Amino acid sequence: MKTGNQFNTVALVGRSNTPNIAEPLATLAACVAKRGFEVVFEAETAREIGITGYPALTPAEIGARADVAVVLGGDGTMLGIGRQLAPYKTPLIGINHGRLGFITDIAAADMQALVPVILSGKFEREERALLEARIMRDGEPIYHAIAFNDVVVNRSGFSGMVELRASVDGRYMYNQRSDGLIVATPTGSTAYALSSAGPILHPQLAGIVLVPIAPHALSNRPIVLPDDSKIAIQIVGGRDVNVNFDMQSFTALELNDTIEVRRSKHTVPFLHPIGYSYYATLRKKLHWNEHASNEDDKAS
């Protein structure tokens, strides 16, 4: 638990093109400003909802000026702003206004009660890992990106299987024929990797997971690697192969292109309410323990 007020400027970020988001954002802005904090808005958010009276800043300006960012939206909104603010080490507070909400853990109905408490200095902090990747073609880097959840190499919807050659730290691992391969952070282990039968990694685990997508051989299983591993995936066969970063940006690949993936030097700080439990999140989102139980989280 971190105590002691260390925040002065609070940035608000909302999910663009989301119906009914303007009112909760305006309510949150008033709630935070009333407690003496300077409130700024991410520029696209301010433009989309038509709010005035607060500075509208780019993500880079938020990183330089704001002490914390409060994100109202779904996991995709959190992923997007998290990647942009990671170089500035700006902490994030996530309010769920989407559907699943693995990383936006505060319910919208609770934001006026919980956000001021966190901003007063009472919170639980954790650092989330990122991946950085680059595409090599003929020995030269042609594309670079970072990912919060995962780097996914996969075929297009109308092509056949791809053949990939994977190596770790310069050591050959395998060739596999499949629909693709997911390289995921612990945060990303509950995203696409989970739907492909990958394991759940606790967010504080220092690991990277490789998960095949519909492999031709059932012996091609997910594997968890140390988080200092350097992973290389070469396109050996197939056509119309793409690489996606958090499923939000992608680029087409050619035969013999290599995707190099490693843990980023940046992390994203998350601030949670006191009493936050990752296991409670899993129970709720994955519908574990569906039957009524008197076993609740107890303070240690």
Curated annotation (Swiss-Prot):
GO annotation, biological process: NAD metabolic process; NADP biosynthetic process
Keyword terms of this UniProt record: ATP-binding, Cytoplasm, Kinase, NAD, NADP, Nucleotide-binding, Transferase
The organism's place on the tree of life at top rank: Bacteria
GO molecular function: ATP binding; metal ion binding; NAD binding; NAD+ kinase activity
Compartments, as annotated in UniProt: Cytoplasm
Purpose: Involved in the regulation of the intracellular balance of NAD and NADP, and is a key enzyme in the biosynthesis of NADP. Catalyzes specifically the phosphorylation on 2'-hydroxyl of the adenosine moiety of NAD to yield NADP.
Official protein name in the record: NAD kinase
Organism for this UniProt entry: Burkholderia lata (strain ATCC 17760 / DSM 23089 / LMG 22485 / NCIMB 9086 / R18194 / 383)
Gene giving rise to this polypeptide: nadK
